[in-house]
Each structure stands twice: as C-alpha cells, then as structure tokens.
Amino acid sequence: MPKDDEYEHTIYNNVEGKPQVIVVGAGPGGLFAALRLIELGLRPVVVERGKDVRERKKDLAQISREHRVDPESNYSFGEGGAGAYSDGKLYTRSKKRGNVDKILNVFCQHGASTAILVDAHPHIGTDKLPRVIENMRNTIIECGGEVHFKTRMDALIIEQGEVKGIETNTGETFLGPVILATGHSARDVYRWLAANNVTIEAKGIAVGVRLEHPAGLIDQIQYHNRSGRGKYLSLIHISEPTRHSLI
C-alpha cells in the first residue's frame, strides 16, 4: 500500500446505526457511491447480482475455455463492473466531469500506485485492480456497511409514488433510498423501470472498434518512427455531436 503522506487521505468513519441507502451494483459507480455515502455519514448496503472480483475471474475463464456463460457473473456483471478485467486505464474524454483528483487519491488509498496522480494517462493495471477493488469493499464493510453478492434486484418497492427499497431474487428485501448503479448491460432493470412508469432518460453511447496489427508494424510505428512515437490517444472530429477517437 502507498504511504499515507503520498496522497490525499479521505477519512471514512464508522456508520453503524446510521440511516441506510441501498446501492444496486458494485461497479465503479456503485463502489464510489458507497464510499461517498460513508463520508456523508450514511450506511451503504451494496447489492450486486454477480460474484466477488476473485470468484468472478473463474467464470471469465470458463467463457474462454468452455464457451459457457454464467448470465449473472461474466464480463458485464460482478464486483468491479465491466472494466474490472480490462487493462485498468483511467481517463475520461468528457470536459464536463470536473476535477478527478479525488477519485485518483481514493484509488491510491486503496492500493493503487501513486504514479497515477502524476501520469498523463494514469494506469492501475489489470494485475493490481482486483486488489484495489477488494480493498474498497473492505473499507465499506469495516465502516459498518454491507456488500451482498449473488443478489439481483428484481423490483423497486414503491409506495404512494416514492421508492422505499428493493426486492431481490433471494427473497430478501432491503429498505431505504436507492441508488441504481447497474451499468448499461442490466437490461432487465431498465425494462422493469419502463414497465412500471419510472422516469428514465436515454443518454448517448460510445461504440468502440479494436483493430489488430502485426507486432512488427506496431514496433516500427512506436519505436522506429522518425516522426516520433505515436500519441496514446488522439481525437478526430468529423461532425458534432459525433466524435471519433483513435487509440
């Protein structure tokens, strides 16, 4: 773990007995929401349909080796979200998200290298990210919160037009205000919301394309190019609001 004096430390106090808030999803949105709730003196109860980040890795291997997919534990669902087993790059192309220093410092507090605080293109790394995610979960639990795996939200509890909690596939209900951090693959959640007249709003999407090249060609471009090394990320503006990114 990095030393405390190498990053800005956030204090997470014990929130046992405090009002609870239900967080649906243990991806980056859900984990950071839970940590922020603790900062505000509220008790997070995180409900995740998939498995913890270590157990989930076995299900990902099963996809590659046996071509069998667990619908609740895969690349989309499980602790850490869809990016848990990507290469751990941290960046945003949005100009509207404000300062991200707090986010980077929280990552460092939970085991990420402090190099991400100064690197132009911060990168945690696939090998280190699961441990960072586990440490975030441990912070939530040690502060009095809860994390429930293999627990899928099946419905909101709505009384007189107000959300009072959630029902789950285990038969257990959780009461309190609800934060939905389900990710874009939880189509069953969005179908339920639409069918039950809960206001939802569509947002723009990003479609990525990965091109594979011979290693020799990439070496030539990156290390033997008289014009210098290619940029890590470049943007080509074709027409607004469309934006094309080349990585």
How should each PLM-predicted stretch be described?
Residues 180-229:
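Glycine-rich loop(s) and the adjacent beta-strand/alpha-helix scaffold that form part
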